[in-house]
Curated annotation (Swiss-Prot):
One of its GO terms (biological process) is flagellated sperm motility. It holds the Pfam family SPMIP11. Coiled coil: none annotated. Microtubule inner protein component of sperm flagellar doublet microtubules. Keywords: Cell projection, Cilium, Cytoplasm, Cytoskeleton, Flagellum. Transmembrane segments: none annotated. Its main location: cytoplasm. It is found in: Cytoplasm, Cytoskeleton, Flagellum axoneme. This is Sperm microtubule inner protein 11. Microtubule inner protein (MIP) part of the dynein-decorated doublet microtubules (DMTs) in flagellum axoneme. May serve to reinforce and thus stabilize the microtubule structure in the sperm flagella. It comes from the Eukaryota. The gene is Spmip11. It comes from Mus musculus. GO terms for cellular component: axonemal A tubule inner sheath; sperm flagellum. The lineage of its organism: Eukaryota, Metazoa, Chordata, Craniata, Vertebrata.
Length: 131
């Protein structure tokens, strides 16, 4: 922020300011709780593991936990994350079906320039090898 002549503002929390706020704020003050609150993670993965370490390990192994940046942050933090913000959160839907413009037709070359070079060199010299 020095280029705006703003100094001594402390550290800027760029990632923290972009993160989704999962905690719900209440204005009313609750009474003092008589028991401990249930252990529920703030990232929304509780329904997957339900406080079971074995289920958590299985979810990590099968990649069932929230891992995409669009599930953690409100806006893309870096330019590399722009693609994941276009993705659909519906499980089982391929990106080509949800976003048809990312699929383009393939126009392959049957005889590429390298293939033509190798064929021509092999016809002229039977001992020709690329290696």
């Amino acid at each position: 922020m020095a280029f705006f002549n703003l100094y001594l503002l402390g550290y800027q929390h760029y990632f923290q300011s972009k993160k989704r706020n999962t905690a719900q704020e209440t204005n009313q003050k609750d009474e003092v709780p008589t028991r401990l609150p249930p252990i529920i993670s703030e990232d929304g993965n509780y329904s997957v593991h339900q406080n079971s370490h074995e289920r958590y390990q299985e979810a990590v192994r099968k990649v069932l936990l929230k891992t995409f940046p669009n599930q953690v942050f409100r806006v893309p933090v870096t330019d590399a994350q722009n693609f994941s913000f276009w993705r659909s959160n519906i499980p089982g839907v391929r990106p080509e079906k949800a976003i048809p413009w990312i699929k383009t037709p393939h126009h392959c070359l049957i005889k590429s320039p390298m293939t033509r070079f190798v064929d021509h060199s092999h016809l002229n010299d039977k001992t020709f090898s690329l290696y």
